[in-house]
């Protein structure tokens, strides 16, 4: 495929709008429509029904983008910048992909990729479309929105014929061919509205935002702004760069908020507009605007130029936006508002979203334009929630901003969760597999779980208060709901699509809630199964893996015995993990679930040997002995293994420590040990060879450890403990290793820290001696965990080395399946079903989780409705097709795509929807340039299809056309119900 996108002719555009709206009530995929309340805000002699809209950028480039934004609640449109370089010449300068908005935003876009003439026509088409939509669909007042031009980048270019003509025609489009065509098409479509259509104003825009390149001299900026005010008589905003804050301020703010990895130097700060030049210039321009009877203000801010250092995007420099830009932009607002006593009007762009838009508006900062937030899942639909958040606030004409409120907002931004970067690098949200051509909706949380829990389903049951059925569903795959509800590594939450909104659904906490509230109901319903007579299983080890295996086997009626050397079952969770993380009562309840199925438990002494167990009649033996052997820390001094030390601490009733304890390691166990030492009175330190960003501990556990005041010594390796000191090598980070983490390398320097005891938490090991004593060769494992000894298996830590509880459960389930000979079969309750309507209602709604409350309400139900690629495409090039059987398919519309790459970031698969989804082509040339599987309609019956065996023509009217059944159904549905996509 090509990155070239086609403007849609106005008759086709309106055919799409009217057909889609009549068919399903959507507007270019926007499900939630804002119907104005009747309130409005005056600006530029016009009125806007809401203070929000798309910033000049990917969401305001094409007519359909603007239409989609309007339907969702936008009323101030800063249309994409035009300049003298345009069309193919400009598009050739834009690399692909050019947008990266998975977290903070980056882009390598520029001005419009269309010609200036095409851009003008797009904006005129959008203007006319919004006029008729407001009237016919009741979205609001036809005069309740404003178009704001954006032009750049130098005076000669702006005064040149191309851009000058554009400005003139936007100010009065009455004589343009496009405006005349729009009126003609609308009159044919809506003859009953001919008088209204005739009255549509040709004055598309009365205002402009000036955008200049980095390094533009202040004199040039002032000349252009003066020209726009005096000669063009346009209300004018001048867009400013964050570089006006100065290098030290920008660097300090970003570093303090966790963005220290973002690289930039001082050259833009030195070359861009300086504060001492800016203030007097803005004062002069403000006076000039007053003299002209116009409004003047500042657009804060432009995106922020940073270096591409990690292959984020193709070019060497990219432009930062979104949540990391907000603290810089609001500090710019703070300084401007104080300097001008609140009298300088500010148009905001720079990380605005649902969580801060009301505060900006209350402080007198508006209009507020957005880009990054509506490039994420939810897309344009996010605008309605923003609008609803402010529509009950007073709507007043601008009389000044509130410097005190802005100052408070700038200060709070530095500590706001929504703008702080996570301590550790974000995990990949993607599955390892390729997106299917068809039927691709999936719940990434389920795919991220080693046991593939039915997460959306049990969350829905919890949401409905059906905790008993929820817990039963959980325990179909998870034998340890209390343990995993408390200490699970919850990889599911790392995959959750809600992370692209604000934070993951609290899956683990909701599981625990289901366990606590549904426990009695579940226990009362469990029944002993019919016993299996030809199998008998011995499980050596009563930790999580052993308990889980016994549960799964007992449920199937397999006689099972657990042999545990300790006096209680529970393994590491009971004997090592501190009580402030998990209680014995929680472990006991999981054990009780297992015992309900008649599992025999033998405690307090070592298990018989494998040979003895076989003689006792056991047909299958599972070694679930864990990894208790301490990892080796080869240094001199007072060094203790973390497992044994933690066991001793947990046995003591009121342990008391003193002195300095240094924990070497950075996993969850290391965090536990440091917190225990700190709580018992010692000075606790964690020593790690790398930095916090690369620590293997869960971020939540790491943050708790930080919050409790444990000291961290990063980039250090222990050498020797002696006389209350620990000698350390100072490390530096080298090249990444196989794990992707940068390897620690000795710097040649050493230092000491206080240390009376070293606790080694560097990774426990399997007890190879125990295995060898039973003839088990650890390096010779057969399929499905079977060892070299027939009938003997290893699972959990004994199989994997130190692993997570849920990985042990996965091993246990697989072992039970081997023993029983078939997978466990179960039904999902009908009450767990979610309607398409309910799933769609959650789209674009941002909300934080409430503590101690079921978080099922926030689940996006991705397996019912995903559509991330649809939401995140600014051009609406990914479209949902509703099939006759009620299922949904995604079709990619080639003519509307410029290969920005944004959809790739949010697809839960390791795929690019713009390349990997079934594609609808507009012309044969487009199809020939592409490698996508897809279709070209040559007429109503003849199609050209590219699929696995190449490109072929097919006759849809033929009964034996050899089309794959699924593709034929999709193609016929597109032809019969969605022909507006290609006509």
Where would I find each of the regions flagged by the language model?
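Glycine/Thr-rich beta-alpha phosphate-binding loop at enzyme active sites
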Residues: 23-37, 242-342, 377-395, 637
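Beta1-alpha1 glycine-rich phosphate/pyrophosphate-binding loop at the start
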Residues: 453-463, 471-472, 500, 504-508, ...
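Glycine-rich phosphate-binding active-site loops on the catalytic face of alpha/beta enzymes
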Residues: 75-85, 242, 359-386
């Amino acid at each position: 495929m090509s990155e070239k996108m086609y403007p849609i002719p106005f008759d086709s555009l309106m055919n799409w709008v009217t057909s889609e709206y009549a068919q399903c009530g959507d507007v270019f995929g926007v499900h939630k429509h804002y119907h104005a309340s009747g309130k409005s805000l005056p600006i530029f002699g016009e009125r806007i029904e809401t203070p929000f809209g798309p910033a000049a950028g990917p969401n305001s480039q094409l007519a359909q983008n603007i239409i989609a934004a309007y339907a969702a609640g936008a009323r101030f449109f800063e249309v994409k910048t035009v300049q003298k370089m345009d069309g193919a010449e400009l598009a050739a300068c834009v690399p692909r992909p050019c947008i990266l908005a998975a977290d903070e935003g980056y882009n390598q876009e520029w001005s419009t990729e269309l010609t200036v003439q095409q851009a003008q026509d797009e904006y005129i088409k959008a203007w006319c479309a919004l006029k008729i939509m407001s009237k016919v669909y009741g979205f609001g007042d036809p005069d309740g929105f404003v178009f704001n031009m954006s032009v750049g980048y130098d005076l000669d270019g702006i005064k040149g014929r191309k851009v000058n003509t554009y400005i003139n025609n936007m100010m009065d489009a009455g004589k343009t061919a496009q405006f005349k065509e729009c009126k003609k098409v609308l009159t044919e479509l809506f003859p009953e509205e001919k008088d209204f259509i005739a009255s549509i104003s040709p004055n598309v825009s009365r205002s402009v935002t000036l955008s200049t390149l980095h390094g533009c001299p202040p004199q040039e900026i002032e000349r252009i702004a003066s020209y726009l005010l005096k000669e063009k008589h346009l209300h004018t905003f001048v867009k400013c760069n964050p570089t006006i804050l100065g290098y030290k301020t920008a660097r300090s703010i970003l570093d303090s908020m966790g963005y220290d990895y973002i690289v930039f130097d001082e050259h833009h700060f030195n070359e861009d507009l300086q504060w001492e030049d800016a203030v007097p210039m803005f004062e002069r321009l403000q006076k000039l605007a007053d003299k002209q009877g116009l409004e003047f203000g500042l657009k804060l801010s432009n995106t922020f130029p940073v270096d591409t250092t990690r292959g984020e995007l193709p070019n060497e420099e990219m432009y930062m936006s979104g949540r990391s830009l907000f603290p810089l932009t609001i500090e710019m607002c703070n300084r401007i508002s104080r300097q001008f006593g609140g009298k300088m009007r500010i148009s905001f762009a720079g990380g605005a979203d649902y969580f801060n838009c009301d505060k900006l508006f209350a402080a007198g900062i508006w209009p507020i334009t957005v880009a990054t937030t509506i490039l994420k899942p939810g897309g344009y639909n996010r605008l309605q929630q923003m609008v609803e958040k402010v529509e009950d606030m007073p709507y007043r004409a601008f009389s000044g901003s509130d410097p005190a409120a802005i100052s408070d907002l700038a200060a709070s931004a530095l500590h706001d969760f929504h703008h702080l970067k996570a301590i550790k690098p974000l995990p990949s949200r993607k599955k390892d597999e390729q997106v299917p051509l068809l039927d691709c909706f999936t719940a990434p949380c389920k795919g991220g779980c080693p046991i593939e829990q039915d997460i959306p389903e049990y969350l829905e049951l919890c949401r409905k208060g059906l905790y008993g059925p929820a817990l039963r569903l959980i325990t179909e795959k998870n034998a340890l709901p209390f343990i995993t509800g408390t200490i699970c590594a919850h990889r599911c939450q790392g995959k959750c699509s809600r992370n692209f909104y604000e934070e993951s659904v609290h899956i683990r906490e909701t599981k625990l809630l289901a366990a606590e509230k549904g426990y009695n109901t579940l226990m009362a319903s469990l029944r002993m199964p019919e016993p299996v007579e030809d199998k008998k299983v011995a499980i050596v080890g009563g930790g999580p893996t052993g308990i889980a295996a016994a549960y799964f086997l007992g449920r199937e009626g397999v006689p099972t015995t657990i042999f545990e050397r300790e006096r209680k079952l529970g393994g590491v969770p009971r004997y090592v993990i501190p009580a402030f993380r998990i209680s014995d009562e929680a472990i006991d309840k999981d054990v009780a679930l297992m015992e309900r199925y008649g599992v025999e438990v033998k405690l307090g002494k070592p298990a018989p040997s494998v040979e003895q167990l076989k003689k006792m009649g056991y047909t299958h033996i599972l070694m679930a002995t864990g990894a208790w052997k301490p990892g080796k820390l080869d240094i001199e001094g007072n060094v203790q293994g973390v497992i044994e030390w933690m066991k001793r601490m947990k046995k003591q009733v009121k342990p008391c420590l003193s002195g300095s304890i240094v924990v070497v390691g950075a996993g969850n166990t290391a965090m536990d040990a440091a917190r225990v030492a700190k709580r018992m009175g010692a000075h606790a330190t964690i020593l790690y060879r790398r930095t916090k960003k690369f620590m293997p501990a869960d971020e939540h556990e790491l943050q708790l450890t930080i919050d409790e005041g444990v000291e961290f010594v990063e980039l250090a390796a222990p050498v020797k403990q002696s006389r209350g000191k620990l000698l350390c090598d100072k490390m530096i980070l080298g090249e990444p290793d196989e794990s992707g983490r940068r390897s620690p390398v000795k710097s040649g320097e050493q230092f000491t820290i206080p240390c009376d005891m070293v606790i080694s938490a560097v990774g426990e090991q399997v007890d190879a001696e125990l295995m060898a004593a039973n003839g088990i060769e650890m390096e010779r494992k057969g399929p499905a965990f079977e060892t070299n000894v027939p009938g003997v298996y290893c699972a959990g830590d004994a199989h994997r080395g130190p692993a997570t509880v849920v990985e042990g459960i996965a091993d246990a389930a697989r072992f039970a399946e081997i023993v029983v000979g078939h997978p466990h079969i179960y039904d999902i309750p009908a009450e767990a079903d979610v309607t398409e309507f309910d799933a769609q209602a959650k789209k674009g709604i941002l909300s934080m989780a409430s503590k101690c409350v079921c978080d099922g309400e926030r689940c996006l139900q991705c397996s019912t409705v995903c559509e991330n690629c649809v939401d995140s495409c600014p051009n609406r090039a990914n479209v949902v097709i509703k099939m006759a059987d009620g299922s949904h398919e995604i079709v990619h519309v080639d003519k509307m795509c410029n290969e920005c790459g944004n959809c790739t970031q949010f697809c839960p698969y390791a795929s690019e929807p713009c390349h990997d989804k079934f594609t609808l082509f507009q012309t044969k040339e487009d199809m020939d340039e592409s490698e996508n599987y897809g279709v070209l309609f040559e007429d109503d019956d003849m199609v050209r299809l590219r699929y696995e065996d190449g490109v072929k023509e097919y006759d849809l009217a033929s009964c034996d056309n050899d089309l794959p059944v699924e593709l034929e159904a999709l193609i016929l549905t597109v032809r019969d119900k969605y022909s507006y996509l290609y006509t």
